[in-house]
Amino acid sequence: MPTINQLIRKPREAQKARDKAPALQSSPQKRGVCTRVYTTTPKKPNSALRKVAKVRLTNSYEVIGYIPGEGHNLQEHSVVMIRGGRVKDLPGVRYHILRGVLDTQGVKNRKQRRSKYGAKRPK
């Protein structure tokens, strides 16, 4: 515990807020190329095969992005758009891949929350 005099000589330094999505470099989205598309298992107590992709961004960061929705068409060398947002039960996955943008197709037969999954309005 510092004394009053010590605090007058050298005030307390405010802690800097840590960026939750550093690879975006303050952009809303970033473009990148898939280097590997694979499935991984979530941590306890959940159980599934979550679809993820390793993406090399235009700023040469390499990040892991989650592919939301049922089914996807991504493979190696697909060009994707990435946004921030982690997946709580997948350690190391801090980004989401946007559906219906660039090489990523929207989710088929999606009726609700369509804008989040790049699905057109059904006729």
UniProtKB/Swiss-Prot annotation:
Q: Does the keyword Ribonucleoprotein apply?
A: yes
Pfam families, alphabetized: Ribosom_S12_S23
Q: Where is the signal peptide?
A: none
Which residues get modified to 3-methylthioaspartic acid?
89
* Disulphide bond pairs: none
Q: Name one GO cellular component term.
A: small ribosomal subunit
Top-rank taxon: Bacteria
Q: Which GO terms describe its biological process?
A: translation
Answer yes or no on keyword Transmembrane: no
What residue spans carry the Basic and acidic residues bias annotation?
10-21
The record's InterPro entries line, in alphabetical order, gives: NA-bd_OB-fold (IPR012340), Ribosomal_uS12 (IPR006032), Ribosomal_uS12_bac (IPR005679)
An example of a GO molecular function for this protein is: rRNA binding
Segments carrying the region annotation (Disordered) are: 1-32
Q: Which UniProt keywords apply?
A: Methylation, Ribonucleoprotein, Ribosomal protein, RNA-binding, rRNA-binding, tRNA-binding
Question: What is its quaternary makeup?
Answer: Part of the 30S ribosomal subunit. Contacts proteins S8 and S17. May interact with IF1 in the 30S initiation complex.
Q: Which family does it belong to?
A: Belongs to the universal ribosomal protein uS12 family.
| Function description | With S4 and S5 plays an important role in translational accuracy. Interacts with and stabilizes bases of the 16S rRNA that are involved in tRNA selection in the A site and with the mRNA backbone. Located at the interface of the 30S and 50S subunits, it traverses the body of the 30S subunit contacting proteins on the other side and probably holding the rRNA structure together. The combined cluster of proteins S8, S12 and S17 appears to hold together the shoulder and platform of the 30S subunit.
The identity of this protein, by name, is Small ribosomal subunit protein uS12
What organism does the UniProt record list as the source?
Azorhizobium caulinodans (strain ATCC 43989 / DSM 5975 / JCM 20966 / LMG 6465 / NBRC 14845 / NCIMB 13405 / ORS 571)
Q: What is the lineage of its organism?
A: Bacteria, Pseudomonadati, Pseudomonadota, Alphaproteobacteria, Hyphomicrobiales
Gene encoding it? rpsL
